């Protein structure tokens, strides 16, 4: 942390010689400070829009702006600066003394100079909302970035909102069928719930979220909002074109489009990445308040936390555990509590959450666990076996796995599958040391079934067709339960393991077994 502080000190030291001339004017400032009454009477004026301040210091993404006495902008207000013909938005983060605010820039600060004018808009960052946003890509401040002209909507909404009141919230236990076997069977998603996809680098979070967009958003009649937070620009571009090709969106937006996209990718400054999730959520909240059932996808929530940590360090806050911001739980809670289902409409949210160094106890993923209804944990050890989606069947959890919600049969099959896999996991050390021959007959059977179940949990994805060459499969919940029930009961003990790998329903596994037998003969 000392390193980060050094440039700040040097910057301050360098700024001193430049400030020598105006230093004489310091006397009136002291007199102003000596008149607390004047400052207090000036406080109500603070909210007045249009106050003009001047930039006094620029350190990376942090910009200090000095305002006339009594015209200090409120915390979270947006300031506008004309940066060489480009509209730069700054968000007020701290009040320094009586007349200076410290702000976070929502875009690059190259080209800013001291003394430049900054105008207080008198309100937080406002983004366009409503059906006009469908089919369009916006950035954090609501500007279109898809080169399809301005977003023609009169309605705008502040990105900072309070969470719905307790009495407005609604809960109903209903499953959202995704067509992905491992998810629907072992950790089903709740309609109007919050779902987290946890995984390290390169285990398939984005592919899984894209598949969910494909399966759920296409079948779902309502609107979807996708917030790309600090992820690869290429993936955002691919998603945009994929949505147009599949008919979810029309080129350039307009009639027939069903998804709004809000992007703040890896190359953006931390201010934009820390706020873009809120901009996306604001668009989704507006649809919900109009009585819609909305799907809200976020890729990646970790980048929201990471950007918050960068901003926090720039603002000079003392870091907490592992260098994260001291307000980690507050930031996460303020956002997650807004993603909720009310009596007006619902938001079903799917969030990809990067797990640094595959450590689920890291404060960033650990903080988000508490807010979720279902967690899908992607495991590197399963991905290494070539089983995709690499969902860990024992680590993934869901509030919906309850016989009252999913029914007795589904519950019993899910628990049986997990107990077989758990037994296999316990036997793995013995197998590694002594080999299969030392196991009892019963354990040998358990291991054989567990290996088939493991393979049957894999499934070809529609969005991965271009890589794998095998067509995607959507499996009905009844077929999923039937297949795993038969596997646990031993109905398919005679089939080879390979027959269960990368197939949809159990019928396809039987077909594949016949093909394999024919090839072997």
UniProtKB/Swiss-Prot annotation:
**Per its UniProt record, what InterPro entries does this chain match?**
AAA+_ATPase (IPR003593), ATP-synt_VA_C (IPR055190), ATP_synth_F1_bsu (IPR005722), ATPase_a/bsu_AS (IPR020003), ATPase_alpha/beta_chains (IPR050053), ATPase_F1/V1/A1_a/bsu_N (IPR004100), ATPase_F1/V1/A1_a/bsu_N_sf (IPR036121), ATPase_F1/V1/A1_a/bsu_nucl-bd (IPR000194)
Its EC number is 7.1.2.2
Name the residue ranges with Low complexity bias.
1-21, 28-42
MF terms from GO for this chain are: ATP binding; ATP hydrolysis activity; proton-transporting ATP synthase activity, rotational mechanism
A Pfam family assignment: ATP-synt_ab
Binding site residues for ATP:
199-206
Q: Which SUPFAM superfamilies does the record cross-reference, listed alphabetically?
A: C-terminal domain of alpha and beta subunits of F1 ATP synthase, N-terminal domain of alpha and beta subunits of F1 ATP synthase, P-loop containing nucleoside triphosphate hydrolases
The way this protein sits in the membrane is described as:
Peripheral membrane protein
Q: Which UniProt keywords apply?
A: ATP synthesis, ATP-binding, Cell inner membrane, Cell membrane, CF(1), Hydrogen ion transport, Ion transport, Membrane, Nucleotide-binding, Translocase, Transport
**Region listing for Disordered, in residue ranges:** 1-42
The family database entries (HAMAP family) matched by this protein are listed as: ATP_synth_beta_bact
Q: What does the record give as the function of this protein?
A: Produces ATP from ADP in the presence of a proton gradient across the membrane. The catalytic sites are hosted primarily by the beta subunits.
Instruction: State the family named in the UniProt similarity comment for this chain.
Output: Belongs to the ATPase alpha/beta chains family.
Q: What name is this protein filed under? A: ATP synthase subunit beta
- The organism is Brucella abortus (strain 2308)
């Amino acid at each position: 942390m000392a390193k980060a502080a050094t440039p700040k000190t040097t910057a301050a030291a360098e700024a001193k010689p430049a400030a020598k001339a105006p230093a004489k004017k310091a006397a009136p400032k002291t007199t102003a400070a000596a008149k607390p009454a004047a400052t207090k009477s000036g406080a109500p004026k603070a909210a007045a829009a249009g106050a003009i301040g001047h930039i006094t210091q620029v350190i990376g993404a942090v910009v200090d702006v000095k305002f006339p006495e009594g015209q200090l902008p409120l915390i979270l207000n947006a300031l506008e600066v004309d940066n060489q013909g480009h509209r730069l938005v700054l968000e007020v983060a701290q009040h320094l003394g009586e007349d200076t605010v410290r702000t976070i820039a929502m875009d690059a600060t190259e080209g800013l100079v001291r003394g430049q004018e900054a105008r207080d808009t008198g309100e937080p960052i406002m983004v366009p909302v409503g059906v006009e946003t469908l089919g369009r890509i916006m950035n954090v401040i609501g500007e279109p970035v898809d080169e399809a002209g301005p977003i023609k909507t009169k309605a705008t909404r502040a990105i900072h909102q309070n969470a719905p009141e307790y009495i407005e919230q609604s809960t109903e236990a209903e499953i959202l069928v995704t067509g992905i076997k491992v998810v629907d069977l072992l950790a089903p998603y709740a309609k109007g719930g919050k779902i987290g996809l946890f995984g390290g680098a390169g285990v398939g979070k984005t592919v899984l979220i894209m598949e969910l967009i494909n399966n759920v958003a296409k079948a779902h009649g309502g609107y979807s909002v996708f917030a790309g937070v600090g992820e690869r620009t290429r993936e955002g571009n691919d998603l945009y074109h994929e949505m147009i090709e599949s008919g979810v969106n029309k080129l350039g937006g307009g009639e027939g489009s069903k998804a709004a996209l809000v992007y703040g990718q890896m190359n953006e400054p931390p201010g934009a990445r820390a706020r873009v999730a809120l901009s996306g959520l604001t668009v989704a909240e507006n649809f919900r308040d109009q009585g819609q059932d909305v799907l809200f996808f976020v890729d990646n929530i970790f980048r929201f936390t990471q950007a918050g940590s960068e901003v926090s360090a720039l603002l000079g806050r003392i870091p907490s555990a592992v260098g994260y911001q001291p307000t980690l739980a507050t930031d996460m809670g303020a956002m997650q509590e807004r993603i909720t289902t009310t009596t007006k409409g619902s938001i079903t949210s799917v969030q990809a959450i990067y797990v640094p160094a595959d450590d689920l106890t890291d404060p960033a993923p650990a903080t988000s666990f508490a807010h979720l209804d279902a967690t899908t944990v992607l495991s590197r050890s399963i991905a290494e076996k070539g089983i995709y989606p690499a969902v860990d069947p024992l680590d993934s959890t869901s509030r919906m796995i309850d016989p009252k919600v999913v029914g007795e049969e589904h519950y019993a099959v899910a628990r049986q599958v997990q107990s077989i896999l758990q037994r296999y996991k316990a036997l793995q050390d013995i197998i590694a040391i002594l080999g299969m021959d030392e196991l009892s007959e019963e354990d040998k059977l358990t291991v054989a079934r567990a290996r088939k179940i493991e393979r049957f949990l894999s499934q070809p994805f529609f969005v991965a067709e271009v890589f794998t060459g095998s067509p995607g499969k959507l499996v009905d919940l009844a077929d999923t339960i039937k297949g795993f029930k038969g596997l646990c009961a031993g109905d398919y003990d005679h089939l080879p393991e390979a027959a269960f790998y990368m197939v949809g329903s159990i019928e396809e596994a039987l077909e594949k077994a016949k093909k394999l037998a024919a090839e072997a003969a």
